[in-house]
Regions:
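Short catalytic-loop micro-motif centered on adjacent basic/acidic residues
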Residues: 7-8, 32-34, 121-124, 244-245
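Amphipathic alpha-helical segments in well-structured domains
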Residues: 40, 167, 207, 211, ...
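Conserved AMP-binding/adenylation subdomain of ANL enzymes
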Residues: 1-5, 12-105
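AMP-binding/adenylate-forming catalytic core of the ANL superfamily
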Residues: 196, 201-202, 224-314
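Conserved acidic residues
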Residues: 4, 51-53, 120, 223, ...
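Conserved C-terminal "lid"/linker of ANL adenylate-forming enzymes
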Residues: 271-272, 288-289, 308-359
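Conserved AMP-binding/adenylate-forming
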Residues: 55, 95-99, 103-233, 239-242, ...
Length: 359
């Protein structure tokens, strides 16, 4: 039996870590290494000392790892960077159809050495993942099993089985799990419903919420998505986050935020202005982006130009019309997802529409 060592870094009260970081490894007879800190030096030591082969994490942590690696790559002398890029290109060519961690370790040994030299698979879930980030790690020889699930469905509903790797989906339903798309629109997008033994029986002491969430044995997830021609599930956003324009177009903030991903700020979030201020309108603006700058950072022309350049990539009806500088850290869940409703309420109570600057 192959030796497996799982690194657990998420809070143990989070469903994905409990299932993927503990129950799953124990069933496989694997070793579990649980860290109570995300300090880089401790994480690096764990990779090397315990020969970590698998790791579960949420998209925000994966994104931070990507930023760290890109920063290290940018520090390389020109000749070494050129050589690294060619090796990455070769690895991409040789592993296009199927991952080969052993081959990738030979080609990109120094990169893999930074992760202990034994890492085979990253498992990510708990929020929407940026396909570009998933592809970045796959191209380095670290396959990312991107999945979708809810605590109400025992964590996992679909998982990408990596045969072949696809960065744009959350995979196919797991065995024994049925998934339907309810009331699809013209593009096939509708609410995702789940049925199977993995679905919870009820919410504790909340029969009304249970009745709203489980209908005829189907769990209504509140997430929107569609199946592609290969049977892979693709997510669009949260039903309650969806914005309907005056022209009848559906907009998902998560799609817009993908375009702004990599913006050099601490964090950001896209809202509909009339969601934050229900009785007010900000000129003709439908959307705005709330920005939390890094400590000591100033909003300058470089950042403004970056915002505008990204905004121009969007279709006209999806473009952000203004921005707001927010001085407090965004509230987050245990899986590090932004609490949109709580943040919107805070902005609505403590900021005036005059704080919105036009783009």
């Amino acid at each position: 039996m192959l030796f497996r060592s799982y690194l657990s870094i998420l809070p143990t009260n989070h469903a994905i870590d409990f299932m993927v970081g503990f129950i799953g490894p124990f069933v496989c007879g694997a070793c579990v290494v649980h860290l109570r800190t995300l300090r880089p030096e401790y994480v690096r030591d764990a990779f090397v000392r315990y020969r970590i082969t698998h790791m579960s994490l949420v998209p925000m942590v994966l994104k931070n790892l990507e930023r760290g690696l890109r920063a290290k790559f940018d520090e390389l002398p020109n000749r070494r960077r050129w050589m690294l890029d060619r090796l990455i290109d070769l690895n991409k060519l040789l592993t296009k159809r199927r991952a080969n961690p052993g081959l990738s370790r030979m080609l990109l040994g120094q990169v893999h050495k930074a992760f202990g030299g034994h890492l085979n698979t990253l498992i990510v879930g708990g929020a929407f993942s940026d396909p570009k980030t998933l592809q970045f790690f796959y191209d380095l020889g670290f396959p990312v099993a991107n999945g979708y699930g809810l605590t109400e469905a025992c964590t996992a509903i679909t998982v990408n089985n990596l045969r072949p790797f696809r960065a744009d989906t959350v995979g196919k339903p797991l065995p024994g799990v049925e998934v339907r798309v309810l009331n699809p629109n013209d593009e096939g997008v509708g609410e995702i419903a789940v049925h199977g033994k993995n679905v919870m029986s009820h919410y504790l002491d909340d029969p009304e919420l249970t009745a709203e969430t489980i209908v005829d044995g189907w769990l209504l997830t509140g997430d929107l998505g569609h199946f592609d021609t290969d049977g892979h599930l693709q997510l669009s956003g949260r039903k309650k986050n969806m914005i309907v324009t005056e022209g009848g177009k559906n907009i998902y903030p998560e799609d817009i935020e993908m375009v702004f991903d990599g913006l050099p700020v601490k964090e950001f979030c896209v809202f509909a202005a009339n969601y934050v201020w229900p009785d007010k309108r900000i000129g003709n603006e439908t959307l705005f982006i709330a920005l939390r700058l890094d400590p000591g950072q100033r909003f300058d022309d470089v950042l403004m130009n970056d915002l505008n350049a990204r905004n121009r990539r969007l279709a006209d009806y999806k473009r952000v019309g203004g921005y707001l500088i927010w001085e407090k850290d965004f509230p987050r869940t245990a899986s590090l997802k932004i609490k949109r409703t709580e943040l919107a309420q805070d902005i609505g109570l403590n900021a005036d529409r005059a704080a919105i600057a036009s783009l």
